[in-house]
Amino acid sequence: MSTPVFTVADIRKTFLDFFAAKGHTVVPSSSLVPGNDPTLMFTNSGMVQFKDVFLGVDKRPYVRATSVQACLRAGGKHNDLENVGYTARHHTFFEMLGNWSFGDYFKRESLKWAWELLTEVYKLPAERLLATVYEEDDEAYDIWTKEIGLPPERVIRIGDNKGGRYKSDNFWMMADTGPCGPCSEIFYDHGDHIPGGPPGSPDEDGDRFIEIWNNVFMQFNMAEDGSVTPLPAPCVDTGMGLERLAAILQHVHSNYEIDIFDALIKAASRETGEADLGHKSLRVIADHIRATAFLVSDGVNPSNEGRGYVQRRIIRRAIRHGYLLGKKTPFFHKLVADLAGLMGDAYPRLAADAQRITEVLKAEEERFFETLETGMQILDAALADGVKVLPGEVAFKLHDTYGFPLDLSADVCRERGLSVDEAGFTVAMNQQKAQARAAGKFKMDRALDYSGTGNVFTGYEHLEETSKIIAIYADGVSAAALKAGQNGVIVLDTTPFYAESGGQAGDEGELISGSARFAVSDTLKIKADVYGHHGTLAEGTLNVGDHVSARVNKEVRAATVRNHSATHLMHKALREVLGAHVQQKGSLVNAERTRFDFAHNAPMTDAQIREVEARVNAEILANSATDASEMDMEAAQKTGAMMLFGEKYGDSVRVLSIGSSKELCGGTHVGRTGDIGLFKIVAESGVASGVRRVEAVTGQNALAYLQSLESTVQSAAGTLKASPSELQNRIGQVLDQVKALEKEVAALKGKLASSQGDELMLQAVDVKGLKVLAARLEGADAKTLRETMDKLKDKLKTAVIVLAAVDGSKVQIAAGVTSDSTGKVKAGELVNFVAGQVGGKGGGKADMAMAGGTDASNLNAALDSVLGWVSAKL
């Protein structure tokens, strides 16, 4: 059967039309910013917008749905950024075709319709398709083999291959408990000329068999004990990657050869002047324009925090690849028009936002190009002279001063076969982050010349307020209005937004007035009673005097107050566990985590950390009510409340009682300790002499952290073919095996070197009564070189010897001089003479010295020069 060529637009329309004809409601793609899952950075699958339906907390007016969902994988757990441009199928942005049944049809219809669409509509050759099913799912197996007619040898049963019951590539779980069920994946066979084996085989990671469609059958509910019971209304969730399907239907092997990427790559070629359409940098640019444009359309502008920072990383990665192609001026934003022409029909919001997207990307380009060339020069200089690892402090300087995200520097190093000291980068980041953050905010806010009245803060009681704009600042200057796309600061007469203070981050949210929407990314104090709402006007126009609906982001506020209240409980627990000397030295509380610095002169033990966690979680389980009372300072002192570091107190203060903790605090907090949900310490470290730092997470973030750890343990256990409870013993066994093998290898190297040493004696040349030998030893390490050197010195008696070995591009050199000859020849001088010719240096004693080098290509010539050098010394 000849497969017809479908364009990407054809594939989308055909898919939606097919399922619409089967009674499905066509649902538009949701935003890349999930509206119902604060733990998820970006929408990464079609089912995200239906998650609440599957969980039973939402009900739609339809029971069958189909969509083409815009997805992004470039941050958090799901992150493909570093692979984009280097492989045939990795993308930041991609489209997911899907169909869903909410308690309506089930396996039979789902699989039969999938087969019908693939073979009868898209005309894929049936003999090229195979399927997998969960090993125990006889129903799906029978549908494939007995009803659809797929030969049994092309239906593969996959069991629990992930280290536990129901832990399988073919058993899907939304979480550790809740809806779950088997799945059936459809694969396309590219043919035996492509390396790789079928799913479930040792070679399954090859490119021959490519998964194109996954049908998930949610038919069970998983309890905490791991048991499953049937759901009263089973559901279907399917997903098929549009780009992968397009590559098959368009008879190409790489996603970057399909029509939409072909057009974008040609547009990138036009703007950069790069004629080689297969250049990886053009692929990177073509991929990244899709991701960045859709993110701007969905309200994510480049920034230094959260989703905005992921956006900035993607934009700057694309710009750097343009620079690599010789483009030294802004070009990336010019591709928006091409993208809108290609995808605007399918995503009308993209076409409508094209002008705004262009302006946002152009502004970011202009900002980065100001420092890009200087930064690249610094990076090039740091990587000169045979350096194999970019120092962490250099990577941080590039990040902090020149706006180079770490992965951009890593990308440059990767192209040159080098790496980045990421641990060193993190150390430098931690040392300067708080100071840089404080300095930046001080400059920003002090630049605002505000002399008006203060505002009323209502955020303890309300998260939404009708307010009046009393001042606007654009680029640090007072303005009468803000227009769409402008960054600015807005001051309100009344606000529910909490301004950063006492270590708690400022609120995020939005200000709405008619069609105007101002996205608040941070709230900072201009003066003690004047709050500046920092952000970007996404739509419309705002003027001084306008009334707005000020709406705090409820999810971010809730996560922040959980962390803040937990910080108070943790402070009390630390004093109980470590001693009364524990005093707060600083803190940072935001929606992601709490970071708490305190006086203590030794690292916390594991037992102490566990005890603090236990005490805090006990307070959470007690579900005690919190109480905040305003009183004068004298009355507050009588209550015994602790005063917090970094907080300036007035005549009237706020005493917060939460659990057994009592402190002065003006921040926002939970109503009851149980609202915190869960508390987990994730890091403990030293930040200065006598100061320790604890980082912790709460609520959903704590759950996500524990689930990630559990996943890591399960994955490691699966790799080592052990249960999680057996993992520690199994690791010990593997380490013992490694040690035994290392001893065996060392012994074999010694035998090999010894045998080579006997042969090398015959190569020694007599120079004025001194035996001179310069030779290579194959497969030797530094230890073997030294041992062989000692044996040769014993046998040759009066001698000068140089031995060298090569491991990849690295060179190890040993120079030895017998004790009766060190007055004439020094081993240290000799080893440096040889090492200097292979890009290295070394040192040692008069009779033995070692060196390393990086240029193995010149080693033979260096060894040949030894005889002349020794002769000149005699």
Curated annotation (Swiss-Prot):
This is Alanine--tRNA ligase. It comes from the Bacteria. It comes from Polaromonas naphthalenivorans (strain CJ2). It catalyses: tRNA(Ala) + L-alanine + ATP = L-alanyl-tRNA(Ala) + AMP + diphosphate. Belongs to the class-II aminoacyl-tRNA synthetase family. Catalyzes the attachment of alanine to tRNA(Ala) in a two-step reaction: alanine is first activated by ATP to form Ala-AMP and then transferred to the acceptor end of tRNA(Ala). Also edits incorrectly charged Ser-tRNA(Ala) and Gly-tRNA(Ala) via its editing domain. Keywords: Aminoacyl-tRNA synthetase, ATP-binding, Cytoplasm, Ligase, Metal-binding, Nucleotide-binding, Protein biosynthesis, RNA-binding, tRNA-binding, Zinc. The lineage of its organism: Bacteria, Pseudomonadati, Pseudomonadota, Betaproteobacteria, Burkholderiales. HAMAP family: Ala_tRNA_synth_B. GO terms for molecular function: alanine-tRNA ligase activity; aminoacyl-tRNA deacylase activity; ATP binding; tRNA binding; zinc ion binding. The keyword Metal-binding applies. GO terms for biological process: alanyl-tRNA aminoacylation; negative regulation of DNA-templated transcription. The keyword Transcription does not apply.
